[in-house]
Every structure is written in structure tokens, then in C-alpha cells.
């Protein structure tokens, strides 16, 4: 809830979100209480990475045509994805998003929006290693601005 960016990943276009997400997990220090992401993270490799990292609560909506990975009669611990899928089947996707805290993900979208408003939508350097350095410097600056104080926001009726 600090509104700070904890990790960043710049990748080539051929890298999927779940693969980039694994890198973000590795680059994040300390305990991770909750991961929220859109359906593009609904892949085994990402769930396995969150399990290895010890993430307590995983809020990723399974794809609409998703199937259970590990059935309920298994002696193994239930998979978080399967628990999410079962709950969605019980109460519906919309209610699941409210119940699970899925909308916390909008804080990430807001941070990315702030980044783009302040620094623009493009990077100035040409090579990927330099772009990563440029993005890291900008993230440090944005986090410092965030630490100095977020604007007061309120609803206008």
C-alpha cells in the first residue's frame, strides 16, 4: 500500500507476461503477501514461481474456459488457482473479484499511469540494457516523489 514500484521488468515482445512475472517475483525483496494480476498470468510456470516464493494469496482470474489442474480428491494441498476457479464457479467472477481483493490490482495500473504521465510513454535509449537502466532510474525518482507525498484525491459529485 506504499504506492511504490517494487520491481520492474522490460522484455522483448516475444516474452509473455507470466515469464516476466517470474522475474518480478525474483526481483522483489521481502515477503509477498498478495499477487494480483490479469488472466495473462494464469499459467503453471507463474503459479509454480509464486509457490516457490511463498506468496500467501494469489488473485489471478483463471481463463473463462479454465479446467481444474488438481482434482479435489487428491491428497496434495489444493492449488490456489483451483481454489479460485471453484470459488468463481460458486459465486461468479464479478463477486469473486470483490471478495478476493482483485481490484487492488488497480493500484499497480495507477502507478504505471503516474510513471507514463511524468516520464512519457517512451524510453530515450536504444538498447535493452540501457533501457532497463533508464527505467530503473525513473522508477527510483517516481518512488522518491511518492515518498514525499501523494496528492489528496477525493470524489467529486
Language model regions located:
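Polybasic low-complexity intrinsically disordered regions
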Residues: 1-56, 62-63, 116, 137-139, ...
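Helix-centered, glycine/charged polyanion-binding patches within enzymatic domains
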Residues: 41-113
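Basic, amphipathic alpha-helical segments enriched in Lys/Arg and hydrophobic/aromatic residues
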Residues: 90-157
Amino acid at each position: 500500500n506504499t504506492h511504490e514500484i517494487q520491481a520492474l521488468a522490460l522484455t522483448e515482445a516475444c516474452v509473455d507476461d507470466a515469464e516476466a512475472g517470474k522475474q518480478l517475483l525474483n526481483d522483489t525483496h521481502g515477503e509477498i503477501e498478495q499477487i494480483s494480476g490479469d488472466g495473462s498470468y494464469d499459467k503453471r510456470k507463474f503459479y509454480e514461481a509464486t509457490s516457490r516464493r511463498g506468496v500467501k494469496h494469489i488473485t489471478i482470474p483463471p481463463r473463462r474456459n479454465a479446467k481444474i489442474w488438481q482434482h479435489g480428491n487428491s491428497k496434495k494441498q489444493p492449488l490456489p488457482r483451483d481454489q479460485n476457479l471453484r470459488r468463481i464457479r460458486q459465486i461468479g467472477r464479478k463477486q469473486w473479484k470483490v471478495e478476493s481483493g482483485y481490484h487492488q490490482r488497480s493500484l499497480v495500473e495507477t502507478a504505471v499511469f503516474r510513471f507514463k504521465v511524468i516520464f512519457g510513454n517512451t524510453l530515450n535509449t536504444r538498447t535493452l540494457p540501457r533501457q532497463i537502466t533508464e527505467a530503473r532510474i525513473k522508477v527510483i525518482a517516481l518512488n522518491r516523489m511518492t515518498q514525499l507525498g501523494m496528492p489528496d484525491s477525493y470524489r467529486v459529485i
